[in-house]
Amino acid sequence: MYLGKVIGTVVSTSKNESLSGTKLLVVARLTEKLIPDGSTQVVVDTVGAGNGEIVIVSCGSSARQSTGKDHSVIDAAVVGIVDTVETVN
C-alpha cells in the first residue's frame, strides 16, 4: 500500500468489461512527507474519494479483492481516505 493524492479522474467509455461501473481516479504517489514523488497511477475508487484528498492505495490481488471483483483487470484501488498522518522527524 502507499499514500497518494487524487489529482484527477478518468472517463473511459470503451474498456474491459470487468471495469464496468467503476470510478477511475488519477493518483499521485506521495513520499513519507506527503510530497508527490513524480509518479502517477490510474486506480479504482472504492470509497468515494475526491480531487485533492490524500488516500490509501492498495495494489495487486488485494486491490481486486477490495472491489469484490476477484477476476478483474484491476491492479490498484483506493481503499481509504486519510484524515491525518504522523511521522517521526
Curated annotation (Swiss-Prot):
Any single Gene Ontology cellular-component annotation: bacterial microcompartment
State where the protein is found: Bacterial microcompartment
Q: Where's the BMV domain? A: 1-83
Query: Which segment of the chain is annotated as a signal peptide?
Result: none
Q: Which Pfam families match?
A: EutN_CcmL (PF03319)
Q: Tell me the Gene3D superfamilies matching this sequence.
A: EutN/Ccml
Primary localization class, coarse: other
Keyword match Oxidoreductase: no
Arranged from A to Z, the UniProt key words for this protein are:
Bacterial microcompartment
The record's section on CDD domains has: EutN_CcmL (cd01614)
- Which PANTHER family does the protein's record reference? BACTERIAL MICROCOMPARTMENT SHELL VERTEX PROTEIN EUTN, ETHANOLAMINE UTILIZATION PROTEIN EUTN
**Function recorded in the entry:** Probably forms vertices in the bacterial microcompartment (BMC) predicted to be involved in glycyl radical-based 1,2-propanediol metabolism in this organism.
Give the family per the record: Belongs to the CcmL/EutN family.
**Assembly and binders:** Homopentamer with a small central pore.
Give the protein name, as stated in the record: Bacterial microcompartment shell vertex protein GrpN
- Write down the species: Rhodospirillum rubrum (strain F11)
Q: What is the lineage of its organism?
A: Bacteria, Pseudomonadati, Pseudomonadota, Alphaproteobacteria, Rhodospirillales
